[in-house]
């Protein structure tokens, strides 16, 4: 559910639609989890079919997220090859100093041979589907120089139009938490501060998150914020942050090809060994063993 603190969806959709029509590229805006928060513009039939398939759509979502995270590291456009082998690029969307999502474009095949970042290892299992294979061959080709020019243009549009006119942040509220809050109590003066704090945490999981910094962000003393946070969430600040990081870690282990060290680093852990320790405490299995279990379950032995 989109919270009341939402981006101007009309503005987002207008810009995305105009850019898609002008360039012939597919465009979508996603939040930091890879969930779509705009309409889908100019999507190829191939990508539409892929996103309708439960397993393939999960890889699409993770590809969107990983591509966005790569772009956010340098705050520059990142041109990459998606899990299905198409060329995409992403632009980080930073509002009021906070990473809130990514603008993703592409869904083209390059007409010239260029070495690109493989954001996830190319997964060719979809090629067993004749319909998908046929639609892939119909995906339009584009010269790499035109992709670069399009990425640079979109960067300018995001910087000079989108960011300057947006005052709010898109997040996906936790539905269970929202319903629980509705049934157990009415709104309180601190509800908005807690939502703001949770948004900040969500957007900074890859940073060195300290309670003092989040408390300062919502204009509360660390002591009072600590008590308030535990009252609202039921657990302490550090435990909550680690839990959110472990949820993201499990998704990345399932659906990305990043090394365990890369996952740890992108989730704010300076030491891989500590990341592995927290993961094992949470799920009673090491990250490596968890990924191996997932791979074994998704690759049944051939007859």
Curated annotation (Swiss-Prot):
Residues 195-293 form the HTH araC/xylS-type domain. SUPFAM superfamilies: Homeodomain-like (SSF46689). GO terms for molecular function: DNA-binding transcription factor activity; sequence-specific DNA binding. Disruption phenotype: Increases expression of the entire cob operon about 90-fold irrespective of the growth medium; expression retains its sensitivity to vitamin B12 repression. Cells lacking this gene are defective in aerobic and anaerobic degradation of propanediol. Pfam families: HTH_18, PocR. Pathway: Cofactor biosynthesis; adenosylcobalamin biosynthesis [regulation]; Polyol metabolism; 1,2-propanediol degradation [regulation]. Residues 212-233, 260-283 bind DNA. InterPro entries: Homeodomain-like_sf, HTH_AraC, HTH_AraC-typ_CS, PocR_dom, Tscrpt_reg_AraC-type_HTH. Positive regulatory protein of pdu and cob operons. Positively autoregulates its own expression. Keywords: Activator, Cobalamin biosynthesis, DNA-binding, Glycerol metabolism, Transcription, Transcription regulation. This is Regulatory protein PocR. NCBIfam families: TransRegPocR. Transmembrane segments: none annotated. The keyword Zinc does not apply. Disulfide bonds: none annotated. It comes from Salmonella typhimurium (strain LT2 / SGSC1412 / ATCC 700720).
């Amino acid at each position: 559910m989109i919270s009341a603190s939402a981006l101007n969806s009309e503005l987002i959709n207008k810009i995305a639609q105009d850019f898609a029509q002008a360039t012939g590229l597919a465009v979508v805006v996603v939040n930091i989890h890879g969930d779509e928060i705009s309409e889908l513009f100019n999507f190829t039939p191939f990508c539409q079919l892929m996103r309708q398939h439960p397993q393939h759509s999960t890889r699409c979502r993770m590809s969107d997220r990983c591509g966005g995270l790569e772009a956010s590291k340098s705050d520059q456009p990142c041109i990459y090859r998606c899990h299905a082998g198409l060329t995409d690029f992403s632009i980080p969307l930073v509002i009021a100093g906070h990473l809130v999502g990514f603008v993703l474009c592409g869904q083209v095949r390059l007409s010239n041979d260029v070495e690109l970042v493989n954001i996830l290892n190319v997964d060719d299992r979809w090629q067993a589907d004749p319909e998908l294979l046929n639609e892939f061959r119909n995906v339009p080709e584009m010269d790499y120089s035109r992709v670069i020019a399009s990425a640079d243009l979109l960067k300018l549009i995001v910087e000079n139009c989108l960011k300057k006119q947006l005052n709010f942040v898109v997040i996906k509220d936790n539905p269970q938490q929202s319903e629980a809050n509705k049934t157990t109590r009415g709104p309180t003066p601190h509800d908005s501060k807690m939502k703001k704090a949770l948004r900040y945490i969500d957007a900074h999981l890859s940073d060195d998150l300290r309670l003092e910094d989040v408390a300062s962000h919502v204009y509360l003393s660390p002591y009072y914020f600590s008590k308030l946070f535990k009252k609202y969430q039921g657990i302490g600040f550090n435990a909550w942050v680690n839990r959110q990081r472990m949820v993201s870690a499990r998704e990345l282990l399932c659906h990305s090809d990043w090394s365990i060290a890369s996952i740890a680093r992108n989730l704010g852990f300076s030491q891989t060994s500590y990341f592995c320790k927290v993961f094992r405490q949470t799920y009673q299995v090491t990250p490596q063993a968890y990924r191996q279990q997932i791979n074994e379950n998704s690759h049944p032995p051939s007859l």
